[in-house]
Amino acid sequence: MSQEGFDKLKASCINSGLCVECGACELVCPKGAIKLQKYQWGRNPELSGSCGDQYCDKCFRVCPARSIPLSKIEKTFFGRTRKHCFPGKAGDFPTPNGEDKCGIYRNVYTGFALDKEIHENAVSGGITSALLIYALEHNIIDGAVLAGFDPATPYEAKAFVATTREDILRGAGSKYQPHPQLLGLRDAIKMGLKKIAITSTPCNALALRKMMLDDDFKEFTSCIKLIISNICGAHWSRHGTEWLITNGLNVRLEDVAELKYRARPFPGDFKVKLKSGKDAEAPFVNSLLGALGRFTPEECRVCLEKVASVADIVVGDTWHHPVLSPPLLMAYTDEEAAKDERIAYARKGMTAVVIRSEVGEEIFNAALSGQAIRAFKDSPEEARAFLEAVHDEGKPLCNGPVIEARIRRGQPVREYF
């Protein structure tokens, strides 16, 4: 039996603490020999069968933990590479000029779904749900891989395939847990879907782009029409969510019927529906979110991918926006708010949207023209200020020293070339 490819993956990506639990290795293994085994602290790719007699390194080639051909990804999917330099080792701090901090982007917007049901069901503006429903109803896609919860364990994140408006609404809202989102792509293909949108974290999007560059993975990637990623500060291990339920809400896990990390009103409450029909909830963004930081997994502590540099469309809250950041919204006077209609809308929840690719721009503009969404285009100065602030106030500040320490000690980090 030859398992040299998996041995490379294990040594370089798994045992190094860099595995992001995306599921790409399990997805592409031609022998079905890799399984993400579940533990309390997370999932771990492990051999559950034979790799076969022939050399195969597909699992290693798709992994987003170590090696990212950023220049080739940008040239292929965005039409050019970013100006000036780009990160080499992930501990290299970007230069203050050029596109190092922001990546390649076409435009930045803030907006919300015009459909009241979609907006009220969302974390902020409902743009992701609105775009996917529009694309589905106009035959741009025939399904979407979304993050939901496992019916058997309703507080555990799990990928699922949405093929109806109702499915998409069921998948609305952030799921703050690492989970093998890319295994949902396998399910979508088995269902016979040919035009698939997939939502993912920035690190999962790296795996998708690596697969899309390699003809060996066409069976998985030829059907991908759109990648939407979220602005990501970190995800937190499942036992962090369990702690919030049992300690933050004083609810037994076996009593949980449904979970929302950020139920309305904006910016959102941590809400659990009990099997008894009762609800238990507490403020999330301004309270419980801080407690989750203690449960940040190792791989998130060595990541700088906050604004999803390789996705078609990036979505998130308006934190760090020069005009619409939530701390600013409540400080405006009525007179100030009357001068900028964005403020009133943002107080009810708006999504920040970064358009990176032509594909993303076409779908976004179609939904805008089709009155599925309302959007306000940031000025070039606002767009730049927003993206730089998201970058500067996030992962480089917290994770940069950790990454530099790993480099100094000869430990592997994610590298871009």
What is the predicted function of each stretch?
Residues 214-229:
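A short alpha->loop->secondary-structure connector
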Residues 58, 66-128, 132:
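Electropositive, gly/pro-rich neighborhoods at or near active sites that engage anionic ligands
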Residues 230-243, 265-267:
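Short, conserved secondary-structure transition motifs
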Residues 122, 127-136, 140-191:
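Portal/gating segments that form or line small-molecule/metal binding sites
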Residues 2-6, 16-18, 24-44, 56-88, ...:
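Iron-sulfur cluster-binding cysteine motifs and their immediate structural context
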Residues 4-9, 13-16, 45-51, 282-291:
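Short, intrinsically disordered, charge-biased short linear motifs at domain edges
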Residues 141-142, 249-417:
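Long, compositionally biased charged/polar accessory segments in the mid-to-C-terminal portions
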Residues 123-127, 151, 198-208, 234-236:
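Gly/Ser/Thr-rich loops at beta-strand to alpha-helix junctions
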